[in-house]
Amino acid sequence: MSLLRNRLQDLPALCLCVLVLACIGACQSEAHEETPSPPPKLKMSHWSLVTGRMKELLEPVVNRTRDRWQWFWSPSTFRGFMQTYYDDHLRDLGPRTKAWLLKSKDSLLNKTHSLCPRIVCGDKDQG
């Protein structure tokens, strides 16, 4: 159950990564549309046939998805989403990180001290 809880905590970061990758992909695909295609004799290798077939299969899916999500790519919508994401997840990241580091340090010191032989470390109460 804790594994599922950890994955749910990572979901906002994963969504942000997917969103950024989608933005990059959309920008690159627009840049590739402007560049001319390579001459036909360079397309004769087996791997270029595979990549050509994959592009042929995936291009309609990518275009449909881009068309459906066009409203989201507008600057105001994207800026609003990023501001909301920052407010919800990243604004207090510094204090949360400091608290986590202190808690982890204390926990690690306690575990280390409990593993240390009494002759070397002494009693906990002696400090």
From Swiss-Prot:
One of its GO terms (cellular component) is high-density lipoprotein particle. Glycans are attached at N63. Residues 1-27 form the signal peptide. The keyword Acetylation does not apply. Its main location: secreted. Keywords: Glycoprotein, Lipid transport, Secreted, Signal, Transport. Belongs to the apolipoprotein C4 family. This is Apolipoprotein C-IV. It comes from Colobus guereza.
